[in-house]
Amino acid sequence: MRIIVIGATGTIGKAVVEALRGKHEVVQVGHRHGDYQVDLADKGSIERLYEMAAPFDAVVSAAGLAKFGALDGLSDADFQFSLSNKLMGQVNLVRVGMTQIRDNGSFTLTSGVLSQEPTRGSAAISLVNAGLEGFARAAALEMPRGVRINVISPPWVSETLEAMGRDGDAGMPAAQVARAYVESVEGSENGEVIDARAYAY
């Protein structure tokens, strides 16, 4: 399969690329680096990406930014940034790409456990993650030509925690998280929220 991986230079994205590249043709997309570049907050940028990268059998999004902060400190702009980037950016990957993806292709998006297990300061991120999960469940009912859509819900990634100066053992290694993405691409699930923790070993 020819698979577009968005966020390919990020911690999870790099692990997903590594997990897929042995069996598939992987097109690496980043905000500033990679085979192609895309700005998820710009629908026109997404349209241009697909024009350049077509044809393709699957899209994996391991990208998207959202603001973390106390509820009484988050501004309208913080919420709008989160909605425009991680939520609508991934929604538009599907809306624009669903007419161009090959038959029986798949979209794999990324939410996160904060949709179901919020913490203090996660209001904007939890909102976005829950929205993505609801979108995927509903969109799966309308995907054309056998196209599937799933969302991966990863926990904190060990490498990210270590970069923050925290205990990496409290997270899950990116290589293990990547197994959930491979399952979404190569499996038959549709309209599912896949908890990456099920793929820990």
Locate each region found by the language model.
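N-terminal Rossmann NAD(P)H-binding glycine-rich loop of SDR-like oxidoreductase domains
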Residues: I4-A19
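Rossmann-fold cofactor-recognition segment
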Residues: V29-S45
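Conserved Rossmann-fold cofactor-binding substructure of NAD(P)-dependent oxidoreductases
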Residues: L40-F56
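Conserved NAD(P)H cofactor-binding loop of Rossmann-fold oxidoreductase domains
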Residues: V60-G69
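Substrate-binding pocket helix/loop in short-chain dehydrogenase/reductase
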Residues: A70-L71, D78-Q80
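Catalytic loop of short-chain dehydrogenase/reductase
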Residues: S82-L83, N92, S106-L132, A136-L141, ...
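C-terminal helical subdomain
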Residues: R137, R145-V147, V151-E159, M164-Y201
